[in-house]
Curated annotation (Swiss-Prot):
The keyword Disulfide bond does not apply. Keywords: 4Fe-4S, Cytoplasm, Iron, Iron-sulfur, Metal-binding, Pyridine nucleotide biosynthesis, Transferase. It comes from Alkaliphilus metalliredigens (strain QYMF). It is an enzyme of class 2 (transferase). This is Quinolinate synthase. SUPFAM superfamilies: NadA-like (SSF142754). It holds the Pfam family NadA.
Length: 303
């Protein structure tokens, strides 16, 4: 089956089965093009609760599909690339979190959405990179445990100096490998370019950026800016939407290392087969789901 026929088949199956395709901004262009909704983790979580589809095909990684299932237990949630995980999410498990919490009794736990359902269930509130600062500010406590991303924790600590942020030492391997020397090098080559960086990058990189934000915030900033050249410090998948929405502007990747291989696992064939056979369904234990739902709902209630 050629690509055109496969896309037609995906559309047919989608209609026949009342399915919706949600894709993260880091997915390959072909997946973004067939998706009904493309966005960051927060947008995908919100859209999952709004859709009346019976089947949600989540083109992303496991924790995203779990979040959709937690929020929409009556929907069948499929993860086409069933082995697409997140190394950062795997850097903490529920037992490690319990031990960490025991060191800091009565300190609330803010859990980055890039985490397992079990870790979410053991936390007090969830956050994404687009609402992390609001979430931390919303808490009454002057101390906050933040898991699992040390870099996002460092960025929050800088933005919310009135609170002590106690970080877990996890990180995104894709963003963490970007070096501040790469920023210096491109700054010299393109002094007129605006640097837009994700807060999962290290503090050394973040402090040299012109703007720091989630993928959706980066896309919005580029759209509204009068600048013509942008250097993008997040996973390369976001370039597709940036170039598509801003055809007269130029976008350059900050580092060639900004590629998440797990995000690149989903192919059209995966999506087609997942829909055709309704395979690779995500199941979350009901006890875990109910506890994790509270942390996600707490987040979604914050405006």
């Amino acid at each position: 089956m050629n690509e055109t026929n496969m896309i037609d088949e995906i559309k047919r199956l989608k209609k026949e089965k009342n399915a919706v395709i949600l894709a993260h901004n880091y997915q390959i262009p072909e997946i973004q093009e067939i998706a009904d909704i493309v966005g960051d983790s927060l947008k995908l979580s919100q859209e999952a609760t709004k859709t009346d589809a019976d089947i949600v095909v989540l083109s992303g990684v496991k924790f995203m599909a779990e979040s959709v299932k937690i929020l929409s237990p009556n929907k069948k949630v499929l993860l086409p690339a069933h082995d697409a995980g997140c190394p950062m999410a795997d850097m903490i498990d529920v037992d490690q979190l319990k031990e960490f919490k025991a060191e800091y009794p009565n300190v609330p736990v803010v859990c980055y959405v890039n985490s397992s359902a079990e870790v979410k269930a053991e936390s007090d509130i969830c956050c994404t990179s687009s609402n992390a600062i609001k979430v931390v500010r919303s808490l009454q406590s002057d101390k906050v445990i933040f898991v699992p991303d040390q870099n996002l924790a460092a960025y929050i600590a800088e933005q919310v100096p009135e609170k002590e942020i106690i970080p877990w030492q996890g990180f995104c391997i894709t963003h963490h490998r970007v070096k501040d020397l790469e920023v210096d090098k491109i700054r010299k080559q393109m002094p007129e370019a605006v640097f837009l960086v994700h807060p999962e990058c290290t503090p050394d990189v973040v402090k040299k950026a012109d703007f720091v934000g989630s993928t959706s915030q980066i896309i919005q900033y580029a759209k509204e800016s009068n600048a013509e050249k942008f250097v993008i410090g997040t996973e390369m998948g976001v370039l597709h939407k940036l170039k598509k929405e801003n055809p007269t502007k130029k976008f350059y990747l900050l580092s060639p290392g900004l590629i998440c291989f797990n995000m690149k696992k989903t192919t059209l064939v995966n999506v087609y087969e997942a829909l055709r056979d309704e395979q690779h369904e995500i199941i979350v234990d009901e006890y875990v789901r109910e506890k994790a739902l509270k942390t996600l709902n707490q987040m979604l209630e914050i405006k």
